[in-house]
């Protein structure tokens, strides 16, 4: 019999219940008020008193209202039909809901029960299978989706029967399994999984090493991220976090893209809803939305649903990773999620940590980032979740707890800087403060040596050193004046500016410059390094400035030209002639 409870106190969206039976941590309950049923999650149990966070507005909720517990945690429903869907944090299909505003207590089924899917069996009767083993395959938007043994299945099962190739709905039984005790299990295309529990149906989780191409030079060349890697993008308002995220999600070499708009302003979420269906996937020429799932929770929705939205997104990503797919998960922004945690922690009168965030913020963030990664599945195939979260620190302060704690766990750090954004140097990633720890991995070094060449990482470290040196000289020139430093210093400074303008800066709105393939990035890097190694002859600082401005202009025109086209080669020849003109004899 289901446990029941009665409301004994309400503080905003935290409700205290007195219960008449056993209740588990993170269990879901429904509180009845005025004909609506409000979904809530247990966050603390003290004897017969239970604290729950409500995922809806608690306006009008009174002491004495009835609550009924479901006996399960917050779960997502997984199966074919999720691609190109827009969900909220509780996996309600937003397209099925009526009206401009979401109504309280209204829940929709996330999948389409009526659609038929063409099923192709991969297993046969008599096969031994375990949890997450592939039984068959359906195609959705040209993506091969696997139908798997239920994730919670224990031990080894035998396939008793499996349907032949044909069209079936998600609720049709496609296979019958027999477990070790002889019990029959009917399997359809639907899976359920609690969002707070990580899926561990894989053989091993090695260190990731394969470069994830994004087409963004400041990432791929200078601070690369790998398939199954983690990164985060902190930056104050107006520095281009969202544009950079859009560029990565559009261009990255991933099979599935999941966007969790968690606590963003409503206008930004609407922008995602209207822009993404229009974006063309550069890899397939089809609409990017066909392989994208958007999970939206705006800042004016109840805070508890923000927390649910990031976990829902990660669980859906783990589902696709179990199929051997490469998933890219973008969360915008994890700061709003941390603020939701802070709000609940404060309402429960827990001991506050720095800036009143919960004391266990560090472990919550690290556990969440730890769910991403590159895995080898039980059948030897590989899958990955690459997770990139944005952080919106208050006032652009990168020393606040969310940024500091994320820095400990994310291996890539792309610091967006107000100063670079003000100078219109986009993407406004600070090349000196940003880093990628994957460059230090021997596995990654070996991969890059085979994929590109053995000198690549040495060259990348050289341009970072030159950028640092250029910054130091710029400060000296500011203090001492142009005449106060030697001409050689001006040359070093302008060589660092060449690296900045040609490699780091990129036009996200130009068709050619927006996406730079690795082959082209290699040529740009080699070209810039060769120029930096060349000694030039100058008499005064004005000559240095005029000469390098001409050079930067030609290189910029090359970036806007199609790779290896006549126009590109023409500019390349002009550049070579210009270099010869001033070469020190």
Task: Report the location of each language-model feature.
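C-terminal amphipathic alpha-helical interaction region
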Residues: 539-585
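Short histidine-centered loop motifs in beta-beta connectors
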Residues: 54, 59, 119-128, 159-167
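P-loop NTPase catalytic core
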Residues: 221-222, 228-545, 549-552, 564
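Short, compositionally biased
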Residues: 43-49, 80-91, 142-166, 184-199
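N-terminal accessory targeting/assembly segments
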Residues: 1-103
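Short beta-alpha junctions and helix-cap segments that line functional grooves
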Residues: 27, 39-41, 54, 69-73, ...
């Amino acid at each position: 019999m289901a446990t029941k409870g009665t409301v004994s106190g309400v503080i905003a969206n935290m409700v205290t219940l007195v219960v008449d039976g056993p209740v588990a941590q993170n269990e879901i309950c429904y509180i009845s008020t005025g004909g609506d049923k409000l979904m809530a999650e247990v966050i603390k149990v003290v004897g017969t008193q239970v604290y729950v966070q409500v995922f809806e507005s608690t306006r009008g909720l009174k002491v004495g209202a009835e609550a009924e517990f479901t006996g399960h945690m917050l779960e997502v429903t997984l199966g074919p039909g999720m691609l190109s869907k827009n969900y909220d944090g509780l996996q309600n299909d937003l397209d099925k809901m009526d009206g401009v505003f979401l109504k309280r207590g209204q829940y929709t089924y996330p999948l389409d029960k009526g659609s038929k899917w063409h099923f192709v069996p991969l297993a046969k009767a008599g096969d031994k299978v375990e949890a997450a083993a592939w039984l068959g395959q359906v195609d959705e938007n040209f993506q091969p989706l696997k139908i798997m043994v239920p994730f919670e299945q224990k031990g080894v099962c035998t396939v008793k029967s499996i349907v032949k190739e044909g069209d079936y709905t998600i609720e049709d039984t496609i296979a019958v399994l027999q477990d070790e005790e002889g019990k029959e299990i009917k399997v359809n295309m639907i899976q359920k999984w609690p969002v707070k529990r990580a899926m561990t149906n894989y053989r091993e989780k090695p260190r990731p090493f394969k470069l994830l191409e994004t087409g963004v030079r400041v990432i791929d060349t200078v601070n690369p991220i790998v398939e199954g890697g983690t990164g985060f993008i902190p930056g104050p308002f107006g520095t281009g976090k969202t544009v950079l995220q859009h560029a990565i999600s559009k261009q990255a070499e991933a099979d599935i893209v999941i966007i969790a708009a968690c606590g963003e302003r409503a206008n930004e979420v609407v922008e995602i809803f209207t822009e993404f269906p229009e974006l063309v996937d550069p890899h397939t020429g089809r609409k990017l939305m066909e392989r994208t799932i958007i999970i939206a929770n705006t800042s004016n929705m109840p805070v508890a649903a923000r927390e649910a939205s990031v976990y829902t997104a990660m669980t859906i990503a783990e589902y696709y990773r179990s199929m051997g797919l490469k998933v890219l998960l973008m969360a915008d922004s994890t700061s709003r999620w941390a603020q939701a945690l802070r709000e609940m922690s404060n309402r429960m009168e827990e001991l506050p940590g720095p800036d009143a965030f919960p004391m266990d913020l560090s472990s919550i963030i690290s556990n969440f980032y730890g769910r991403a990664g590159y895995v080898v599945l039980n059948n030897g195939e590989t899958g990955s979740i690459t997770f990139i979260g944005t952080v919106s620190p208050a006032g652009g302060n990168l020393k606040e707890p969310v940024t500091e704690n994320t820095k400990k766990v994310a291996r890539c750090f792309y610091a967006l800087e107000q100063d670079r954004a003000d100078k219109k140097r986009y993407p406004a990633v600070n090349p000196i403060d940003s880093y990628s720890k994957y460059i230090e991995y021997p596995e990654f070094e070996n991969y890059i040596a085979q994929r590109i060449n053995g000198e690549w990482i040495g060259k990348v470290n050289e341009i970072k050193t030159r950028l640092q040196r250029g910054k130091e000289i710029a400060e000296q020139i500011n203090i001492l004046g142009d005449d106060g430093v030697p001409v050689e210093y001006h040359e070093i400074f302008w060589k660092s500016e060449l690296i900045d303008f040609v490699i780091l800066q990129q036009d996200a709105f130009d068709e050619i410059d927006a996406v730079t393939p690795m082959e082209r990035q290699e040529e740009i890097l080699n070209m810039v390094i060769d120029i930096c190694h060349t000694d030039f002859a100058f008499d005064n600082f004005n000559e240095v400035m005029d000469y390098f401005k001409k050079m930067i202009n030609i290189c910029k025109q090359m970036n806007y030209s199609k790779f290896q086209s006549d126009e590109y080669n023409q500019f390349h020849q002009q550049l070579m002639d210009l270099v010869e003109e001033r070469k020190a004899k």
